[in-house]
Amino acid sequence: MACALRLLLGVAILAGMTMTSQGQPAPPAPPPVPDGPRYVVTYVDVMQTAKDEGAALVRQFRDASRKDAGSLRVEAARRFGLPNQFVILEVWKDQPSFDAHAQAAHTTQFHDRLKAIQNAPYDERVHFPLSVGPLPASLGGPAIIGVTHVDVIPPQRENGTALVKQLADDSRKDDGNLRFEAVTQTNRQNHFTVIEVWKNRKTADAHSMNAKTRAFRDKLAPASGALYDQRFYKALD
């Protein structure tokens, strides 16, 4: 009798688990990737002993890429406190122009030369615009560049998209902001990159502490799929 009761209890628990899993609707499929500009964010990490060589390679790649057909903006920056880490920020007219650039001889040469000194694999992420302003001139001087990778779990994609878009729309109005862009990864639409440029460190810090930014982080936290990874850089000369 006891064995029969245990068996019935096990069947009931299994049935309940099955009903629960079946009762949860799958997250909606992401929409098709739109045509138009491609925003490319690439993280480069070289050995500490090769930081100067890495900077030279990144500069050469930046300068050569600016001459490629379809290039709308190509910038490079070095991370504060970690001079062996860089970010490359590119904007291309469309996917075909980016694809052609990716096959260019100078791009292949850059990748080959970088492999000998890299600390981590070349991390390139292709995006389409979510909330961006006009394309300003390239950076320089005391400007502070913030680059943040935002990852939300797939069921929260639509909510995450709305939150990140609102942050960009609001932040472009803040004092000292020179650029605030939110872009969506083409191959994972629950992943975003936020690119922000501030007049100086004081205005960047003020934005990070204001009520709107803190409220955004509070709302995003339950949907997050990974650490909110914010990094600050200074443009390479």
Region annotations inferred by a language model:
Residues 8-18:
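Bacterial N-terminal signal peptides
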Residues 37-45, 75-102, 142-151, 181-208:
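Short, well-ordered beta-strand segments in beta-rich or mixed alpha/beta enzyme
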Residues 24-36, 75-84, 109-145, 179-188, ...:
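Glycine-rich beta-strand-turn "strand-cap" elements at beta-sheet edges
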Residues 61-65, 69, 102, 114, ...:
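Sec/Tat-exported extracytoplasmic proteins
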Residues 50-73, 106-110, 154-178, 212-216:
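Short amphipathic alpha-helical segments
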Residues 20-22:
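Sec/Tat signal peptide C-region and signal peptidase I cleavage site
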Residues 1-9:
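Bacterial N-terminal signal peptides that target proteins for export
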Residues 158-237:
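Structured core of small recognition/catalytic domains
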